Amino acid sequence: MADDFVPGLEGVIAFETTIAEPDKDGGSLRYRGVDIEDLVGKITFGNVWALLVDGKFGPGLPPAEPFPIPVHSGDVRVDVQAALAMLAPFWGYRPLLDISDDEARDQLARAAVMALSYVAQSARGIGNPAVPQSRVDEAATIVERFMVRWRGEPDPRHVAAVDAYWTSAAEHGMNAST
């Protein structure tokens, strides 16, 4: 066996990215050069989304449009996939090759928040009435809107926990373990 043989994928670079940068020792993670410790609990997920997608802080995710979920199968994944597929032709989305980068970004943001809205609506369950849009509109962040749409009156600690989780998991990246 050769002296330079290393089993597995140790040392193999599959690709390079500027979006997420874990340190080699696993002690820290940076999104676009910003340490995750400076984001979690300090910057809302909607604005972290802007950092990841746009490369800078700015207008994050817009509020979802008040479309009720049109499918209730009892399976959140099925409901969301079916509902999102209905929006593209309704909104007139065209193939990515036929639109500008700015239009693609706006469409991605619009679809992303609708996915969150549909997850919340489906997870709320068929037997529970929808939360009034006026209540959803009182929420200050994308995560709070999600939680209100799902739970009605969420515990602020739960909103903070979900926001922290979504921020920390927003860019998993692709590493040898995946």
Enumerate the language-model features and the residues they cover.
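Hydrophobic alpha-helical bundle cores within soluble ligand-binding/oligomerization subdomains
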Residues: M1-T178
